[in-house]
């Protein structure tokens, strides 16, 4: 995750949150449940991990680069394609940057949207300063429920995570928010025996075109027409 515009919680860098699951293992469990869904995900380490864990969803994944925009953009896709399942892979820092989107989810209740929040309790990409969720007081799932998202839960192991995602993908009546407490440290990744994470060899512009062309092909619509200058 990248730094927010305001300073993160002060204090020394802390250990990873107590969790029996790495983010990569959770990604593998989720990827196994997805086929033709559209995925919007955050910037930072999650990008390369998803690129490695879900190669079959490469064209269907939009790698977002603005903090606080992942779930709002996924919500827009869900509204525009109500017959299509959309998955938001957000982060604790990203969601904290735009908590207002939870109120919109609570009011609009898009039944085709699953929101996963990777909560490692830190801004990892700038060295690991803590986010507000590390205090033990700030509960993103509780905030979501308070905003009207009835199906919002926090999970700490792969089995519970997979079950919560399966429930969200099967429910067509309301959105689900799954806050996954994860270990994103290199040590945890190595200890779990995960493969080496491959770097994504494309930039944001190429990713956008790939994603749009995928939506066009699978939906039979034109979103970005031919350029008049070609």
Language-model segments: what does each one mean?
Residues 1-4, 193-230:
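SAM-dependent methyltransferases
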């Amino acid at each position: 995750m990248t730094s927010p515009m305001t300073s993160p919680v002060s204090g020394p860098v802390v250990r990873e949150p107590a969790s029996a699951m790495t983010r990569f293992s959770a990604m593998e469990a989720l990827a196994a449940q997805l086929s033709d869904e559209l995925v919007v995900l955050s910037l930072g380490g999650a990008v390369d991990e998803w690129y490695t864990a879900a190669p079959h969803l490469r064209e269907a994944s939009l790698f977002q680069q603005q903090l606080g925009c992942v779930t709002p953009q996924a919500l827009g896709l869900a509204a525009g394609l109500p017959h299509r399942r959309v998955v938001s892979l957000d982060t604790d820092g990203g969601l904290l940057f735009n908590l207002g989107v939870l109120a919109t989810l609570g009011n609009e209740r898009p039944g085709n949207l699953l929101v996963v929040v990777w909560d490692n309790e830190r801004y990892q990409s700038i060295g690991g300063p803590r986010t507000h969720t590390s205090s033990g007081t700030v509960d993103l799932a509780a905030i979501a429920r308070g905003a009207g998202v009835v199906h919002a839960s926090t999970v700490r192991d792969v089995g519970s995570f997979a079950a919560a995602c399966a429930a969200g993908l099967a429910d067509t009546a309301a959105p689900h928010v799954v806050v996954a407490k994860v270990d994103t440290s290199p040590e945890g990744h190595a200890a779990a025996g995960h493969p080496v994470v491959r770097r994504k060899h494309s930039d944001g512009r190429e990713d956008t075109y790939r994603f749009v062309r995928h939506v066009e092909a699978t939906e039979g619509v034109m979103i970005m027409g031919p350029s008049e200058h070609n």
